[in-house]
């Protein structure tokens, strides 16, 4: 399939993506990269739940998804935020198709723990053919993190884990976690390359803190036999130069220097 890159954009960054970000995507497609996007939508879901007076709670950092919460999550993820993202891509000259993990049986899942988390899934299989077909025709699939069980029940899935699973199924060359910072910083300098061991040391030192901790843990867990390189990049500026990507690269291990 040529070179493939998967981007994961969190719900908090989608509405703040810069023109440079979209131009970078265009540059990548023009140089032969095939692109898939997976997005979240947490802040928009929270706003809509408040608007509709639907109570929600978090268990171990994960939103408990009752049937009422799932209806809202699907409305936001497959509806408003997905179509907003598609429109932004189209506006910047990037042909995009909005889908959810339910379409084409893209994401198949089992219940994570119905008693504790409700309608939340653990991805067990990715059917990448639909996404591959769209990319082969020059479209960017924009994927909302919803899934179906074997019995066709809808389950919400963590967007980071969905992006990781999609990247593995597509055998992507790179998986990019798009954030509001250009990478992981230490003493005002961006760290270019980290291993999982480096990440744990930097967390212990307090260099990586707050909202960046779950991001780096997701990036670290995304490293698999199929996905050997994950990057944390900015959606608020350029993440691409003529020669390379700008961001912090997370790899399994550094090559030995002979």
Curated annotation (Swiss-Prot):
What pathway is this protein said to act in by its record?
Answer: Amino-acid biosynthesis; L-arginine biosynthesis; N(2)-acetyl-L-ornithine from L-glutamate: step 2/4
Keyword Nucleotide-binding assigned to the entry: answer is yes
This protein's UniProt keywords: Amino-acid biosynthesis, Arginine biosynthesis, ATP-binding, Cytoplasm, Kinase, Nucleotide-binding, Transferase
Q: What GO molecular functions are on record for this protein?
A: acetylglutamate kinase activity; ATP binding
List where in the cell it is found.
Answer: Cytoplasm
Provide the site residues for: Transition state stabilizer: 8, 215
Question: What is the name attached to this protein's record?
Answer: Acetylglutamate kinase
UniProt source species? Bacillus licheniformis (strain ATCC 14580 / DSM 13 / JCM 2505 / CCUG 7422 / NBRC 12200 / NCIMB 9375 / NCTC 10341 / NRRL NRS-1264 / Gibson 46)
């Amino acid at each position: 399939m040529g070179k493939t890159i998967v981007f994961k954009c969190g719900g908090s960054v989608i509405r703040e993506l810069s023109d440079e970000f979209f131009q970078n995507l265009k540059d990548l497609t023009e140089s032969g990269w095939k692109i898939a996007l997976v997005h979240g939508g947490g802040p928009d879901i929270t706003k809509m739940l408040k608007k509709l007076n639907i109570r929600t709670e978090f268990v171990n950092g994960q939103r408990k998804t009752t049937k009422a919460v799932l209806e809202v999550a699907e409305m936001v993820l497959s509806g408003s935020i997905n179509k907003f993202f598609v429109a932004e891509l189209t506006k910047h000259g990037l042909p995009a198709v909005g889908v959810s993990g339910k379409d084409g049986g893209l994401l198949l899942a089992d219940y994570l723990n119905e008693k504790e988390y409700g309608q939340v899934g653990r991805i067990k299989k990715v059917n990448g053919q639909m996404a591959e077909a769209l990319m082969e025709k020059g479209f960017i699939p924009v994927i909302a993190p919803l899934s179906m069980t074997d019995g066709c029940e809808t389950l919400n899935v963590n967007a980071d884990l969905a992006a990781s699973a999609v990247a593995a199924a597509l055998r992507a060359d790179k998986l990019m976690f798009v954030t509001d910072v250009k990478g992981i910083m230490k003493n005002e300098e961006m760290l270019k390359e980290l291993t999982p061991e480096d990440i744990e040391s930097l967390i212990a030192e307090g260099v990586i803190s707050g909202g960046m901790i779950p991001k780096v843990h997701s990036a670290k867990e995304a490293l698999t036999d199929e996905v050997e390189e994950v990057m944390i990049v900015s959606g608020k500026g350029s993440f691409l130069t003529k020669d390379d990507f700008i961001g912090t690269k997370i790899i399994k291990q550094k090559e030995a220097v002979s």
